[in-house]
Amino acid sequence: MKVSELNLKAKSLLEFHLDDIELSGEISKITIHGSGHWYFDLKDEKSSIACVMFKGFNQFVQTQPKVGDMLDLRGYVSLYEASGRYQFIAKSMQKTSLGDLEAKFLALKEKLEKEGLFDINAKKSIVKFPKKIGIITSFTSAALQDMLKLISQKEYNLCKITIFNALTQGQSAPNSLINALKKANEYDLDAIILARGGGSREDLFCFNDEELARCIFSLKTPVVSAIGHEIDYVISDFVADLRAPTPSAAIDMIFPNKLSLEQGLDELTMRFKSQMLNHLKFYQNKIDHLQNLAKAKSLENAFFLRKQKLDFLQSQLKSVLNLKLLNYENKLNNFEELLAQHKNFFDKSKNLINLQKDGKNISLEKLKKGDIIKLCSINESKEAQIL
């Protein structure tokens, strides 16, 4: 018997024997397909099942369901032949009440908000040019690799990155995250990024832990919560000092790039020139005024006294200007050193190679034998084949 024959037979048996089923549970994951079909996972306290509600049926549902909704479904069990995965085909849907996860989330959110853990006045600020940043996430996560890649593209090599490994899913995750936060707080960091890529409501629920929230609030180091995707909200987002919609967005929000450094230098230079011109104009007007007063005096003694005062003011002007020039010269030297440090990083980055397959970036571990790839540097690109 072929695999396709077995799957077809199993599908027929399931649809024949389980053709009219009432099913209740909570949505933990849902995808609204462009075709209009709804694909979602329904779960209870022990298990979950993949479900589908085709457009022909869901058009009669008044409200589109979302993660956390409790549903009563009616339909039948079938099997997707291509993968051999069995699923529940919903023909009718009735929303009942908030799911357990959503109810717990809202209750904890209300409790902590009343205690002031979300108070905007309690938020700690993050420096514009950080020197030391901690990242708490799983060492093996794709989110970490994306963040490190984006940091390298920022061309900002003045910041030391310290990574703290932690579980980001499951019952043991809150304690693991708390331990990592406490450890990171002992370092002299400018900020801590708490990061985790996208996942289902259940996958991200460890970031809705009360003890974790209180730990974040108690830290002396500012915390950035970068959990899931932009539509995902967890308790750590509300209690943290800054919320980033994604891990990659956290890097964009915290790390300056070469352009911002150059803009900062240009702004400082323009401010310096403007202040110098204003000082010169002010003292020149004062000198002109004193000279006019001196000319108006006919008595030699009065003229002599005014001339003495003018000499004194000129001496003061010279001292003030010298002090200002020295101050701004020191600032310009500091920025020149900063740009010189960046130049070494830019020169090294020219030798970096980017792997592409079918016009898209690809990581080395995803390549397989026979793949045709393109090796791209800043100045040129070459095609190659994996042997």
UniProtKB/Swiss-Prot annotation:
Q: Which GO terms describe its cellular component?
A: cytoplasm; exodeoxyribonuclease VII complex
Catalytic activities: Exonucleolytic cleavage in either 5'- to 3'- or 3'- to 5'-direction to yield nucleoside 5'-phosphates
Location comes to:
Cytoplasm
Q: Which UniProt keywords apply?
A: Cytoplasm, Exonuclease, Hydrolase, Nuclease
Q: Which Pfam families match?
A: Exonuc_VII_L, tRNA_anti_2
A Gene Ontology biological process noted in the UniProt record is:
DNA catabolic process
Q: Provide the transmembrane region boundaries.
A: none
Its EC number(s): 3.1.11.6
Primary site of residence: cytoplasm
Listed GO molecular functions? exodeoxyribonuclease VII activity; nucleic acid binding
The task this protein performs is described as: Bidirectionally degrades single-stranded DNA into large acid-insoluble oligonucleotides, which are then degraded further into small acid-soluble oligonucleotides.
Please give the family membership noted in the entry: Belongs to the XseA family.
How is this protein organized at the quaternary level? Answer: Heterooligomer composed of large and small subunits.
Protein name (Swiss-Prot/TrEMBL): Exodeoxyribonuclease 7 large subunit
Q: Which gene encodes it?
A: xseA
